[in-house]
Structures are given as C-alpha cells and as structure tokens.
Amino acid sequence: VGGFLFALGSYKFSQLSHLQIMFSPFLPFMLLYLLRYLEGGRKKDLLLFALFCLAQSLSSWHYLVFCFLAAGLLWLWRAAASRGGEEWRRLAGVLLALGAVLLVALPLALPYLRAHGRLPGFERNLTEIKGFSAHPADYLTALRGNLLYSRVSSLLPHGEIGEERVLFPGLAAFLLALLAVAGWARGRKRAPADPFRRGLPLFFLLLAAVSFLLTMGPEVAGRWNPLYMIPYHLGMLRFIRVPARFYVLFLLALAVLAGYGTAWALSRVGGRGGRFPAYRAWGAVLLALVALENVNLPVPMVEVPHGGGIPQAYRWLEKEEAVIIELPTLGLGEEHRYDRLLDFLPRDPHAYSELEGLRVYFSAYHRKRTVNGYSGYFPYSYNRIFYEMEAFPSLRCVELLQGLGVTHVVWHWDLVPPEREGEYRRRLLSTPGLRLAADLGGQWILEVEEGGVSRPDDLELEALVPEVVRPGEPFNLGLAVRNPTPLPTVVTEEEPQGFRLVITDGEGETVEEERGSFRPPFFLQAGEGAVLPLRCRKAPGKEGYYRLDLHLEEGIFGERRFSFTLGVREMPVSEEPSLLEGRVEYAGTAGVVRIPAPDGLFPLDFRVTAGGDTYLLAARESREEEIARPRGLVHLALRFEKEGPVWEEQRGTLPCDLPPGQSVLLPTLVRPPDTPGRYKLFVGLTDEGFRWFGEVLVLDVEVGDGSG
C-alpha cells in the first residue's frame, strides 16, 4: 500500500512534465538502509545507504536537499535517544557517509556554482517563491483526470498536469496514516520491544509535519515561516523555486504511515489459516481502495519523431560544423521593460516549452551547439536574444548572430503565417549577411556570414551621478557606454564587473567606501548606447559637499576612474513628492524617427530633465524590492499609437537618481510595432502608480518592412 502510494500516486502523475521530480526510486531505499544501519550497525547497510543517497541526489539538486533533510532528521531522532558508545559510533558513520556523498557530488555541482556566481539573479527570489508555495487547500486539490474525484464527483478543486500544487493523495492515505498514529499511541503488544523501532511511526509523523511546513514556503497563514526562511537566508534553499515540491518528503512519510496503518488494521483481522487468509483479502481491498483514489486517465502521450521521421534539416546539420539558432520562435508577449529588467514572456508558455523541448530533443541527433532551449531560469542574454530575434531577418539581428558566433539559422516555414510567406522569402534572400545554404521544403538552412566585432575596451564610458543626494540614504548612479566603432559589440559572458566607490570630505577623510558589481553590456550596434546601473548603499550623513571617486577594477573595460563633486542635502523624494515635474527631449536627428524593421528591439536616445523640487528615484536595491515597493520609482514611459495604443506601455530606467534641475542622456531600447507603417510615439515620465507627469513628447515614427 505504501509503495503504491509513493510510486504511483496522483502527485507523480501531476509531475509528468517534471521528470526530475517524478524520478525518486532511491529515496525510500536510502531511508531503509539508514534505518537498518542505525539498528544493526552493518557496514554493508551503511554503504548501501550512501549509494542510494548519492544516486537520488544526482538525479536533481532538489533531491540532494530532500535526501539530506530526511537523513538529517532521522539522525537527530536517533541521536536524541542514543546513550551507548556503539550508537554514537554508528551516528558518526552516518556523518562520514553523508560527507562522502557531498565530496562525490561536488564536482558535478561546480558548473552550477560557477553559473550562480556568474549570472546575476541566478537564484530564486522570495516573490517568485511565494507564487509557488503551497496552501493548506492544495492538500485537497485533485488532478482533473482523477477517476474518483473528477470524473465521478466534483467535491474537490481540480488542477492540471504540470501544476505544482495538486497535492491530494486520497482520503484512504490520510485514514490509514491516522490508524498508524492510533496504533502507535495504544502501544499494542505486537509492537517491537526496541524503543527506536517502536517510535518510527512518530518519526515519520514528524517528517510529514516538517515537510508540510516547508511546502508552505516563506509564510504559513501569512506569518513568517522560520523553518523555511532560516535555511533560505543561509543560502541552502535559494535554488529551489517551488517549495511545494517538498511534498515529495510529505508523500514518503505519508506512504510509510499508510503502510503502518495497513499493518495495524490487518493485525486486527482474524482468519489467517486457509489458502487465502482473510487478512490478505482485506489487504487487497485496502490496496484497491488506494489505487482507485489514484487512477488518473487518460495519461497524456505525445509521439515524437524518430528514425526516418527526423526532419531533414537535422540530418543535414549532422555533416556540418555549425552553431545554430532555430527560428522563428512562438510569439513573445508584451513585456514593459526592455532595458536592465527583461522578463521572458511567451504568449503561450506551455506551447513555447513544448516547441523548445522538441528542439532540444532534435539536438541529440545533430549534436551541434544551439542558442535554443528552455529552463526554469532564463538568463538576461537568452531573453535579450529572442526578443531581438522577433525582428529577424533584420540587419541588427544578423549582426547579433555574428557576434554570438552563430553560423546557421534553421528557418521553420510552418511557424510563418501563410499571408506573410512572400514577405519573409524576400527578406531572407535579400538581407546582407545571410545566404541560403539548403532548401529542404519545410525548413530552410541559412548560413550566417562571418562578421567582425569590436572589443569591449573600445567602448566609450561616462559615469552618471546625481549632483545632489539625500543624507544617509542609498542612491543610484550609472555608467553610460557607447560604441564609437563601425562594428557591433557583443559580450556573451555575464560575469559581474567590479567597481569601488570612495566618498571623501573636504579634508580628504574617507566618509564612505564600498564595493559592488554591475552587468556588462550585452549587444551594442555601431553608435548605440546603453546604461549600466550601479548603486551606492549609503550617502554621507551630513549635509555639504563631498568628492566621489568611482574606480572600475580589472574587467572587460580595463581600469578606469571617474571623479565628481557630490552634494548632500534634504529634499522631497518621489515616494512622497512635493512638486513632481520633468521634461523629455528626443536626442536623435530632428524629423521622422525611422525604425528599419518591425518588432524586435531598437535603440533610441532621450534627454531627461528633472523639474519641480522633488528627487526622482531611479531604482531600488533589488528587483524583488522593486516589486514589493514600486511606489516612488520614476521611469521613462513610451507608448506607440495608431488608431489606439499598440503594444503595451513600455518603460525605461533612468540612468541615475535625478535631483531637481539635473539633466541626463538616457539611451534605451524600445519594442517597435510588429507591422510596418506610420505611428505616433508618446514619451514622458511616469511614477509607478502609472501616472504620467511633466511635459509629454510626441514623435512621428516610420516602421520599415526590413528591406532597407
């Protein structure tokens, strides 16, 4: 009964789209052999415990945490009742085994750890985690395909396969677990004399309770959850996006308790003689009841091409030395930030994952490096590439692919609307830098010609610092970078770049000194600019004038230094403004703004001037804090219109905080309309209450068809 519940319960069906969570065959055996070793002390059992712990941990980093949590809890349980030296020697053996597991797993974890250090944001923030935390009601949510609770009755809420919070294991499992606790409490004579073994139902009840609280994530009923938050702040849970997955341990504990409950119930059934004793019949009934509650039909199946069904394009690529990208992707949705904060929002996330998953599958045939893929985490570079590729085949897209080292584009005609096939054929065959290498019917293979790129240390840099800041408060500053060369710049690594800030008073005494990091620019065409945000955690506490020195330490730009006079005084801030005013001017050539191709991303430059008497906040310390406290942040706002709004209202981050009267240049990226034509572009300033203020700039924009 317990084995069926853990291996084939509804939760495993709900995780069909997450094979790494479904796959947990070694977890029960790990605990089994740990129990045997703690009871008998046989080295064979210790070795098997370590092997099963390692095997399960290597299947997913989630399971590394799950294994160590379950084993650690059992270790503490045993340690609390241990008195003799032999028992402590066994406990020491368990610690050595767990240490050996970590040593073996560490080399495989190093790439992950390097990526974590290299990619800003490669960890789960609390806002994201809360969205994937369980609620008590989720333990009564059944799969929509459940035979008993969906098709026959509608007593319970329903969830779909792939959803993370479908956690109802069936009523029988709960009842059998209650019987296990009741049997333990009554201390029946058939229970083992060994106190450790006699207390195991209570241990699994404890494991279920701990796991239940962990599935709740950062908060339980709106209150801080120390069981989750303490290890999170220690860095132990920052890579786990879905606290609800701790349900695996809850399910394991529940399954064991259900097994105990079944044994206790059957021990009360007489009639053990005969060819088919009554207790076996009742056991079969209980198993059938548990199985009935966990029947989920139909099981979704998808047939994937194989053998001769593999598309010709991938067979063609097998023979080539290539780095590829497959286009087009399924359409990307409307993201309102295209600068430093760029989420990845497919219009249909499920369909996008299916398509990219299939492309990853085909990569096993052609075995070439590819830009495509999907994950639970999308780095900024991935997001930026595919938003840029919405304009493919534009010259800007080709230059980006050249900088990335992409040699071939696999173009899928089945993803092109029939009414636009002629347009795309013309553009694909006429765009400089692309050559048709193979026409395979449903797919074209386009060769990307080699192109030059400039070096990051060729970029021009200017530090942008607020002239006046508020005493004792953090403030934002920035690095304006511009590509003065005739070649594009592409920085494929997202290694954080270090900087040092030193603030000194009029006598040369250091008042504040701190270090930080920033993300390098990703892609800049010839003449294009961008802003790299920096932050100072604390301004001087006294009003007056200071010297601020910004040192860029060794990195892609080399060593550079900037010095400024920094004023400090009290003033109203945009969180609680007095007079909120501002002006935006277009910094490009006068007349109609011409954007060569529809969709994708395109750079525009504006000059922003703060008016009124209020200090304008550009950003907060983290994205998480910006989501939690949006009020008071001031952004550039852009809206394309043609007989009504086109796309969403877009945002651009100010280069630095702006005190009244200061003016700065703001290069930003916009997403043009996806259809060629004439548009109006409204540009102004907005606070995060989505209220525009100050003067509004109106530009005439011509979006070309990509042929120019």
Describe the residue ranges of each PLM region.
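Membrane-helix boundary/interfacial segments in multi-pass membrane proteins
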Residues: S14-I21, E128, H135, R151-L167, ...
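Membrane-interface transmembrane helices that cradle and orient dolichyl/undecaprenyl
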Residues: M30-L47
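Perimembrane helix-loop-helix junctions
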Residues: Y33, L38, C67-A100, V181-A193
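Hydrophobic alpha-helical membrane-interfacial segments at the cytosolic entry of transmembrane helices
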Residues: F49-F52, E86-L110, N125-G131, H135, ...
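Signature aromatic-anchored transmembrane alpha helix within multi-pass, membrane-resident enzymes
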Residues: G72, L95-L102, V256, T262-V295
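Hydrophobic, aromatic-rich transmembrane alpha-helices
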Residues: L103, P169-R198, L206-L213
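Periplasmic/ER-lumenal interhelical loops and adjacent helix-loop junctions
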Residues: L106-W184, P243
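Extracytoplasmic
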Residues: N125, K189, V285-L464, R470, ...
